[in-house]
Amino acid sequence: AASDVYKRQVNQEEWLQIIRNNIKAALAVNPEYLVWHVSNCNLKEIFTFDFFYNDAQVIDASIEVFNAVSECIPDNVIVLFENLWWPGLRLIEPGIVDRFFCGLKKQNVGIMLDTGHLMNTNISLSNELEAVSFICQTVENLGMYKNYIHGMHLSCSLSGSYQKHSCKAVPECCSMTEIMHHVTSIDQHLIFKESGLKSLIECIEPSYLVHELFYDNLAELSVLVQTQQKLLLK
């Protein structure tokens, strides 16, 4: 339904106004921070991995959009830009990260690091210890922008095997069920089960930590969160 609303906008200003309205709706609950995803991918590209736009192009367009609507965000509310594995702010190229933040007009900004999304960019990862090492090294490579990481969405996603063996073609029957199965097979939102999370937290030192996991009910979520929290101490 939300996508239909965007599609009905006939010009740029109407589209930007929808974004402003969404921001105002979020601000109504007095948040400490807002999260903004920086990525671009159409339905075909989700399956083929053959992307029309590269990181720099998506970054430049995102800068333009954000600067056009940022005036409605109070200075005391920080905007945390989240990484994805599709073209945009993937965090694996420090130059792209620098290009993005240098282009923003708003000063109170930072990064919401999604561990699963970052893991999805490296299809060679085979276990959790490799993943933690990769995440920490990627963060260190950001230089000064390491300090821009204020929050973390914590989950495990070792989807390299699935991505390697994906048929790279759009299914004939491309239903929402097919789409969601494919996307969630890549972005798995599982818990970490091995030790090593303590070193990850010490490396990043986030002010906000969200256990972003898939679950069927609140009872299951409670168990998953408790399990992952215990690993933070090991």
Residues of each region from the PLM?
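Active-site acidic/histidine proton-transfer and metal-coordination neighborhood
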Residues: R8-G110
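Short, active-site-adjacent cap segments at secondary-structure transitions
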Residues: N42, L118-M119
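Histidine-acidic metal/acid-base catalytic patches
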Residues: L16, N30, Q107-L113, M119-K234
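Short, small-residue-biased leader/transition segments that mark boundaries at the very start
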Residues: A1-Y6
